[in-house]
Amino acid sequence: MTILSAMQRTGIPVLACLLALPALADGPGGLVTGSFGDQPLELTIAPELSDVTIIGNYADASFLAAQMEGAQGPVNLILTINGDLPAPGEMELMIAFARDMGRNWIGDQDSLTLALDDFAAGDGIVALKGTITGQVSGGPGSETRPVTFSFDARLEELD
């Protein structure tokens, strides 16, 4: 009986952790993948620096995603989307490479195209999925670079 009780004692916490995994996956966070020029990037969305407010048909969403490893060094990406759903008219994308301090890359609705595949609210979390393509400007020589990013985000909805 001691073997069975030992298995129960260790098995119950393990089972509880496994059952909690789907709930954790549904919490805030997500992933951004794509390219900046010819450089592939994969960034993790920081839940504590990302949120959305919805008032009627108007939405104001923003998230910060970061890539800490890789040849480019730390990279931050901030995407802000504002406007009436289902097609918000304003957006801004900012990309900052830690090695190029003060030389951010920025694009907005004039140089970028946003395709939203999903914008659904439920239980205090908003699922935001889509693709942004176009051009960003900045960097050391005020250059222009093509970007394509797909994002699959779960953002906390603020009141």
Predicted regions and their residues:
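Bacterial N-terminal signal peptides that target proteins for export
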Residues: 2-12
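N-terminal signal peptide c-region/cleavage motif recognized by signal peptidases
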Residues: 20-22
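An ectodomain-focused feature that recognizes extracytoplasmic/extracellular
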Residues: 25-109
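Acidic, glycine-rich flexible loop segments
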Residues: 90-156
